[in-house]
UniProtKB/Swiss-Prot annotation:
Gene that this sequence comes from: leuS
Motif 'KMSKS' region: positions: 629-633
Family: Belongs to the class-I aminoacyl-tRNA synthetase family.
Protein name (record): Leucine--tRNA ligase
Gene Ontology process terms (BP): leucyl-tRNA aminoacylation
InterPro entries: aa-tRNA-synth_I_CS, aa-tRNA-synth_Ia, Leu-tRNA-ligase, Leu_tRNA-synth_edit, M/V/L/I-tRNA-synth_anticd-bd, Methionyl/Leucyl_tRNA_Synth, Rossmann-like_a/b/a_fold, tRNAsynth_Ia_anticodon-bd
Length: 865
């Protein structure tokens, strides 16, 4: 400790330490100092345990938003704590840099996607550094860099060689005016192109897929291993994989040798089938449609082809269809059943055909009601029967009726018997089906990772000979026609690596999820020019110990990353099954929002003259006021730069961490930001006092013990808050309690006081790293506070020598005395009876009974006069 420092500033290792809290000056100074000292550089492997802290990397839009700030601040606090607790920590950052916005910028602004992207990366990198985030910038990755995407291409070839990458026809969104393929996000709610306004068509194009379905069962089963993930995320993934156990059943087409094959999870209802539905795109539609129905069927199929899959399968959307005029035979009953086509059946899912059982399925019941189809019940409740006509479908287990030889069985028992009977008769077989479909990775875009395939007339698709297959520079963008790559004949024309004959490059690029499905592996060996990662390094650092990101990535990104990990494990490239041990899905940052309920329009807060009675300045209507996720369209965002300019990064970090538990939504409140700034100023003034008073011996032993207890109570509670669930907000509350205890301490300069101030700064450092560093140097620290060990808990300091004891007379509190914490019942009773309080109230009274509650109170019951 260094005491008696009365000058306004002092020197610490060549860095000036100011005695006035100026956050902007302090933060700039220490950020430069840390960078020069490479304080956050990842250590090489040693005997210490490892900890890999990871935030989901951002798309480089050019500006940070508060959601970014929250995500990265949470992860940074965790990483800083783990470093101080003796772990060697990997904490890196990169950029998910391919994607549609860069192409849109190229079209709208006439700039090259690479120039626009790298400019945004540079801008956001500086913004991240201003937050004091402890990243090892030597491990930075940018997915649009050839140094990165050559390995994305190499990994694609690993899938290709394993038979997990293939091409097939698939439906895409087609803009008939611009003559180009659109991503789903480029199609508005009315099914029109966002740029041309054309009604989007659905077309078939040859696309590349990864066979994720080969891993469906393992992806599902291994969710049980992920005990460090939120239960709702595991459930979302399980539902997305969508395992269904049931059977294939085959219905012979009347007057044909072909059959309609359906999958059902309810074979027990097969006797109640009253119609069969094909997807409009099903290959059998043409065959089963009668001449009389051809016009209606063709018109309906054309209409459905313009409807998105999302619309077709929406739960609240009425299901529509038309009859084909054809029939199948129910092999179980021998009855003819009509064949329909309907919009809710998708050709890509299952067999593209379903059996309709209105009596026992809600969707089928609604469809039957709409089109007057018969309802044939084949399962009754175990107790009693349902009167006909059935008011609603019966979807629970029950007893079989109207089901031939299976009548009287429980529906659960009948399932297995009906499947066995179908297998015996050649009508079907048991089957497990998954909702999960193979991953379509083709994008008809320029700004993506090129697929490293050459198409040869003789050899077919062949892996490119040399990687990376680089994107060409200086491409012209019009927003019309095929992908810009497909229009570059010099780039497309190449030589087959196998036979040497003329061939053409694949012009599709990869889904950006391909790049983000393995970036966490690259961080382990980010500068290696020879390989994506070495096995030693990836197995040393992985799996990620703590992953932090938004719930919006709960399914696709996390599922694809898990898939990548399992495939690369099977290719012998790594030795673990799952990429992320623990997952924290931080809540959204919400802003105060003003909305006119009559017009539905949002009003910016700076147009509100009286926030206590907000009205629309244009109409005079009273506005609704509520918190909602920050967005530009709602005018409720807060620019992080504004907060940093006014209060500094440490205040922003403290507010973000204190306002709400990490997993809960956070409501932005300027008053609370101001409150955190005031708290840091209190800590600043406290340290100024501690650094300028002379060290003394303790004059009051009890006060000294009480303060030591407060300090070690804070260490214990703070550490426990961070240990399991990262309750960062309650950890900061402990800092506030400790600050109050130190401010109230009667003996500044005593050993417990000075130790307490040191401890406060050490605990504050992961959350507010700049001010903590400055204050640590003012307290005489000889090295960075971020290199200091974690405060050590002294459990003996928590022992309480004396406790308060309440004295009650007839249940009414009359006062409190101090007693030894070790006193037993008899001693407590005697101490209470002998106290001045009891003597005063019991004088002349007869004690009838004494109630002792150890550690709390003694109650004297006296006789009535």
């Amino acid at each position: 400790m260094q005491n008696g420092a009365n000058s306004r500033s002092q020197e610490y290792q060549g860095v000036s330490v100011d005695s006035r809290y100026d956050p902007q000056a302090i933060e700039t100074k220490w950020q430069q100092s840390w960078a020069a000292a490479q304080l956050d550089r990842t250590p090489e492997a040693d005997d210490r345990p490892k900890f890999y802290a990871l935030s989901m990397f951002p798309y480089p839009s050019g500006n940070l938003h508060m959601g970014h700030v929250r995500n990265y601040t949470i992860t940074d606090a965790i990483a800083r704590v783990k470093r101080r607790q003796g772990f060697r920590v990997l904490h890196a950052m990169g950029w998910d840099a391919f994607g549609l916005p860069a192409e849109n910028a190229a079209i709208d602004r006439g700039v090259q996607p690479a120039d626009w992207t790298y400019q945004n990366v540079a801008q956001m990198r500086e913004q991240l550094k201003q937050l004091g985030l402890s990243y090892d910038w030597d491990r930075e990755v940018t997915t649009c860099s050839p140094d990165y995407y050559r390995w994305t291409q190499w990994l694609f070839l690993q899938f290709f060689e394993a038979g997990l990458a293939y091409q097939k026809e698939a439906t895409v969104n087609w803009d008939p005016i611009d003559q180009t393929v659109l991503a789903n996000e480029q199609v508005d709610s009315e099914g029109r192109s966002w740029r041309s306004g054309a009604k989007v068509e659905r077309r078939q194009l040859k696309q590349w897929f990864l066979k994720i379905t080969d891993y469906a069962e393992e992806l599902l089963q291994d969710l049980d291993q992920l005990t460090g993930w939120p239960e709702r995320v595991r459930l979302m993934q399980a539902n997305w994989i969508g395992k269904s156990t049931g059977a294939y059943l085959e219905f012979p087409i009347v007057n044909s040798s072909d059959r309609v094959k359906v999958f059902t999870t309810r074979p027990d209802t097969v006797y109640g089938v009253s119609y069969v539905v094909l997807a409009p795109e099903h290959p059998l539609v043409t065959q089963v449609t009668t001449p009389e129905q051809q016009t209606a069927v063709a018109a309906f199929a054309a209409e459905v082809s313009q409807t998105s899959e999302l619309e077709r399968t929406a739960e609240d959307r009425p299901k529509r269809g038309v009859p084909t005029g054809g029939f199948v035979t129910n092999p179980f009953t021998g009855q003819a059943v009509p064949i329909w086509i309907a919009d809710y059946v998708l050709v890509e899912y299952g067999t593209g055909a379903v059996m309709g059982v209105p009596a026992h399925d809600s969707r089928d019941f609604a469809f039957a009601q709409r089109y007057g189809l018969p309802v044939q019940p084949v399962i009754q409740p175990t107790e009693g029967a349902i009167a006909e006509p059935w008011p609603a479908p019966f979807t629970e287990a029950g007893v079989m009726v109207n089901s031939g030889q299976f009548d009287g069985l429980s529906s659960t028992e009948a399932k297995a018997k009906i499947i066995a009977f179908a297998e015996e008769q050649g009508w079907g077989q048991a089957h497990v089906q998954y909702r999960l479909r193979d991953w379509l990775i083709s994008r008809q875009r320029y700004w993506g990772c090129p697929i490293p395939i050459v198409h040869c007339p003789d050899c077919g698709p062949v892996a490119a000979a040399d990687l990376p297959v680089q994107l060409p520079d200086s491409v012209q963008f019009s927003g019309r026609g095929p992908s810009p790559l497909a229009q570059l004949e010099d780039w497309v024309t190449t030589t087959c690596p196998s036979c040497g004959k003329p061939a053409r490059r694949e012009t599709d690029t990869m889904d950006t999820f391909m790049c983000s499905s393995w970036y966490y592996l690259r961080y382990s060996d980010a500068s290696n020019p020879e390989i994506a990662f070495t096995k030693d390094k990836v197995n040393d650092w992985l799996p990620v110990d703590q992953y932090v990101g938004g719930i919006e990535h709960a399914i696709l990104h996390l599922l694809y990353s898990r898939f990548f990990t399992k495939v690369l494990r099977d290719r012998g490239l790594l030795s673990f099954d799952e990429p992320f041990k623990r997952l924290l899905t931080q809540g959204m940052v919400q802003g105060l929002t003003y909305k006119n309920p009559k017009t539905g329009k949002y009003v910016p807060s700076d147009r509100i003259s009286d926030p206590s009675q907000p009205v629309d300045p244009d109409t005079g209507d009273r506005l609704e006021v509520f918190f909602e996720k920050m967005s530009k369209s709602k005018y409720n965002g807060v620019d992080p730069a504004r907060v940093l300019d006014r209060y500094g990064a440490d205040t922003a970090r403290m507010f973000i961490l204190f306002k709400a538990p990490p997993e809960k939504d956070l409501e932005w409140d300027d008053a609370d930001v101001e409150g955190q700034f005031r708290f840091l100023n209190r800590v600043w003034r406290l340290v100024q006092t501690a650094s300028q008073v002379e060290a003394t011996t303790a004059a009051d032993d009890k006060a000294e013990k009480d303060l030591r207890r407060a300090v070690h109570t804070a260490i214990q509670a703070f550490t426990e808050d961070l240990e399991e669930d990262y309750q960062l907000n309650t950890a900061i509350a402990e800092l506030m309690k400790l600050t109050n205890a130190l401010n109230d301490a009667p003996m500044p300069g005593s050993p417990a006081y000075l130790k307490g101030v040191q401890t406060l700064v050490l605990l504050l450092a992961p959350f507010a790293p700049h001010i903590a560093e400055e204050l640590w140097q003012q307290l005489g620290g000889e090295r960075s506070v971020h290199l200091e060990g974690w405060p050590v808990l002294d459990e003996s300091a928590l022992i309480v020598d004396e406790i308060p004891l309440v004295i009650q007379i007839m249940g009414k509190t009359r006062g409190t005395i101090t007693v030894p914490a070790s006193a037993d019942r008899d001693q407590l009773q005697q101490l209470a009876k002998n106290s001045e309080i009891a003597q005063r109230w019991l004088d002349g009274q007869t004690i009838r009974k004494v109630i002792v509650v150890p550690g709390k109170l003694v109650n004297f019951v006296i006789a009535s006069p």
